[in-house]
Amino acid sequence: MKKLEKDIKAYLKARNWHKLRPSDIAKSISIEAAELLELFQWQSLDIKETKKDKEKLEKLKGELADVFLYAIEMAVLLDLDSEKIIRAKLARVEKKYPAALMRKNKSEHGTQEAYLKIKQEYRAKNK
């Protein structure tokens, strides 16, 4: 991850983009995420169906890379350690949504219900 961050920092500096405002990068992340979402508009493809559609998969990889790049660019510009913040978030999510609880009901709908219940309880506690 450090090598990737270093490469992105050089990429930004070479284009004089190392002075971008975090608000502009946040907007770009949102725009690129919307473009990623647009690939699925009016469809409800599962993982298997998505993997089968090679054309969609190529477009998806491009949009996903855009989101990743902007997110890492923001971390680099703010001198944040991307790996460290991702691992910290993963640890918080592991506590918030324990695997055993999420696996309890094996149906997709049951897992979604458990997720939403946990999320609502969490938000109520943290108001």
Residue ranges of model-derived segments:
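Flexible "arm" and connector segments at domain edges
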Residues: 1-64, 68-127
